[in-house]
């Protein structure tokens, strides 16, 4: 696997020098300062690429070129936004960058209720609490008919949870959910957030699928012409939230995706932390069946709790994700490609990381502290080395 690292640009507290010292060779980044929907021009792309290469690294993957909300709802100026997207893809390809991660999640990127969940060893992790989220939806946001998405028991627990919240607790939970996280590109006030949700009130799962299919049919020919690889990121969490449809959450969704647009340019990001939240997602089977469409991997693990919809982020080799067999299957896919003349490694980044050691004293991007990811990368690197030596070299 190609060892990569997500970098949020010049303002990231983790520097390119730090990343190189961590042992990564590839950078995963985006032009976060460009508003969603606007064209990434070549000057901007080359400036970022040069900055990376001057530190002895390469820009391996774009994460992400954000998809404008009007493309997802297929309203307003969606045609113009798609044309802009095509131009950005073309410009990236002509600058020598050929792998683009993106997502089609309505309104929000990845969502958590707690960005500083304390673990028994004193480290901090990201957490999604189903009951806290229910309290937010029902009693803070007051989304119409939100109760229908929760069991009677969950509703009762949410009421108790909300009744025990202080004003500061409510503000913090609201901020965690709607203010935007690294990669989300946009943040919202409560009123703005509800207005964004309302834009989807008539958009069903099937309708959102139709909109993604239309988008792919428009951009895949550009990818084919310029040798680009698309890698859609799964929903996080991988289920409907806030009354919004989610369409990239399961192996059945991947089957639909690759059927409606069979071009090899239409690929996936194998995010084990997102898919792995669902106990009915067999990660190894996903890799076995769709390995030829995996162009990017995010390796992390989560731990489901007593309420199976509540989870926190585990260390990279622990939790519910069988990282041993996941990495084994990724290596099998790499060797399969090698046999047919494709020697390119699959880009992998250690996704998220606990806030540990000296980073506990620093201001860090939630999930993207340096030392936690350094630890995760080292663990995965060691696992890969052991598997390669034991099962693949000279065989």
From Swiss-Prot:
Biological processes, Gene Ontology terms: D-glucuronate catabolic process
Keyword Iron: yes
Name of the protein in question: Mannonate dehydratase
Function noted in UniProt: Catalyzes the dehydration of D-mannonate.
Keywords assigned by UniProt, alphabetized: Iron, Lyase, Manganese
GO molecular function: ferrous iron binding; manganese ion binding; mannonate dehydratase activity
SUPFAM superfamilies documented for this protein: Xylose isomerase-like
UniProt-listed InterPro entries: Man_deHydtase, Xyl_isomerase-like_sf
Enzyme class name: lyase
Known catalytic reactions: D-mannonate = 2-dehydro-3-deoxy-D-gluconate + H2O
Pathway given in the UniProt record: Carbohydrate metabolism; pentose and glucuronate interconversion
Membership in a protein family: Belongs to the mannonate dehydratase family.
Residue ranges the record marks as coiled coil: none
Necessary cofactors: Fe(2+); Mn(2+)
EC number: 4.2.1.8
